[in-house]
Amino acid sequence: MSGEATVLAYHAPEEQEGLLVVKVEEENYVLDQDFGLQENPWSQEVFRQKFRQFSYSDSTGPREALSRLRELCCQWLRPEVHSKEQILELLMLEQFLAILPEELQAWLREHRPENGEEAVTMLEELEKELEEPRQQDTTHGQEMFWQEMTSTGALKSLSLNSPVQPLENQCKTETQESQAFQERDGRMVAGKVLMAKQEIVECVASAAMISPGKLPGETHSQRIAEEALGGLDNSKKQKGNAAGNKISQLPSQDRHFSLATFNRRIPTEHSVLESHESEGSFSMNSNDITQQSVDTREKLYECFDCGKAFCQSSKLIRHQRIHTGERPYACKECGKAFSLSSDLVRHQRIHSGEKPYECCECGKAFRGSSELIRHRRIHTGEKPYECGECGKAFSRSSALIQHKKIHTGDKSYECIACGKAFGRSSILIEHQRIHTGEKPYECNECGKSFNQSSALTQHQRIHTGEKPYECSECRKTFRHRSGLMQHQRTHTRV
C-alpha cells in the first residue's frame, strides 16, 4: 500500500511554485537507515504485505509465529520512529483502502496519498477529471471509434470507402429521412442507425474532417454533423414495418453501454428519441415530436458498474479501466504500466528528459502540461483553493489541506526524541535532523553539508556572489534577508 507508506515518506516540493490539482514534482525524503527505504520507497508496502500475508504455517511454532509477526509489524509501522498518531493514520488509511473497490485501491496505491484526507481529495479529483470532456488524441480516438463500430456491425449500413456526399445531397437525404420518420408511428427500426450516426458525428468532429463550402448561415457544428450524417445509406434507414421491430442491444452494450435519453436536433427535424434500456430497443412516437433544441453533447454511454455516463464511447472505455484494473500501456524502459496512453507519454519523458511545455513568461520547461499550468500561477497569482473557515486562498490543493490543520489543531506528527508535535510530516523530518545529525544537502563546490535545502541555497551564494536582498533606501545588497533587516535599522535610527 504505497499510500500508507507516504506517512513515512516525505514529499517536499523543491520549489513552492503554485499548484494545480495534480501532484507536483517532489523531492522524496524518507526517514530510514535500518531498512533502506531511501533507496526503495515501496519497501513499506512490502513490509505491510509480509505482515498481512504471514501465516502460521510459515513458522515452527506459536512463539516463533508471534515473534515473527511482531518483527514484521515493527518493520511496517516502525514505532521507534513514528508517533501514535502517525501509526493510527497508517492503520486508518489501510482500512480505508481496503473498503474501496479493488480498481480504486490500485489507483490510489499508485498515486500514494499521504493520509486519508488526501486519499479522499484524490478520488474526488479523479471523479471530476473523468466527468470533464477532454480532447481526444485524434488518431488514437478515431481508431477506437471505428474498431468499436466495426465490431458491433453498426457500420454495415455505411459506405466507408465512398467520399463524403456533397452538402446539397445531404440536405435532401435529411429531408427524406425526416419524412420517413414521421410516417412511421410507434416503434422504429432506425435505433441502430441513429447510434451509428452519433458515433460518426463524434469521430468526424474529433478528427476535424471538414470539407470546404460552408453554406451561408450554417454553423460550424451543424456543418460537421451534416457531413457525417450525409454518408448514411438512406435506403437501409427505411427498412422495417409500421408496427416496429425490436432491436436487440449491440454486443458491446451488454456490459458497457447504456443509451440514456437521447435528444438530437437535425436541421430538417426536431424530435425526441426515447431509449428503452430494459427492452434493449428504441421507439419513437409521433406525439413525442417537439420543437426543441437539444444539447449535442448529451451523455449517452453509461457505465454498468457505477452508473456514470459519458458523451463519447472512448471516454467510457477509458473509465471502465478503473473497474477492470486494465493497464494496456506499458513502458518499454522500465515495464511500468498505465491505464491511459497520456500517462505513459508523460512517464516516458522521465527517461527521455523531454520537457515540451515551456512557460512563455520565463522560458522554464516542464514534462507535463499540468506542471506548466501550476507554474503559471506564479506569474498570474491565481489561487483557486480557498479555505472555508478563514477564506485564505492557495495555489495548491495540498497546501489547503495542510492549512486546514491550523483550524482543527491537528498536530499528528510527533518527535519520539523530544515529544514535540508538528502539523506536517515535512517539518517533523526537518526537526528530527537535529537529533540524528543528518545533513543530506551537500555543496558541489566545497563539499559542506547542511540539514536544510534553504541553508544550502544561502551557502551557495558565497560561491556565486549572488546578493538578492537589496535595500530600497541606499540600494546596498545582501546575501541574507537577516543582513538586510539589520542594515535597514540604520536608516530607521536616523
From Swiss-Prot:
GO terms for molecular function: DNA-binding transcription factor activity, RNA polymerase II-specific; RNA polymerase II cis-regulatory region sequence-specific DNA binding; zinc ion binding. The keyword Nucleotide-binding does not apply. There is a cross-link at residue 197 (Glycyl lysine isopeptide (Lys-Gly) (interchain with G-Cter in SUMO2)). Keywords: DNA-binding, Isopeptide bond, Metal-binding, Nucleus, Repeat, Transcription, Transcription regulation, Ubl conjugation, Zinc, Zinc-finger. This is Zinc finger and SCAN domain-containing protein 30. May be involved in transcriptional regulation. GO terms for biological process: regulation of transcription by RNA polymerase II. It holds the Pfam family SCAN. The keyword Cell division does not apply. Residues 48-130 form the SCAN box domain. GO terms for cellular component: nucleus. SUPFAM superfamilies: beta-beta-alpha zinc fingers, Retrovirus capsid dimerization domain-like. Belongs to the krueppel C2H2-type zinc-finger protein family. Gene3D superfamilies: Classic Zinc Finger, DNA breaking-rejoining enzymes. It is found in: Nucleus. A zinc finger (C2H2-type) spans 301-323, 329-351, 357-379, 385-407, 413-435, 441-463, 469-491. It comes from the Eukaryota. Disulfide bonds: none annotated.
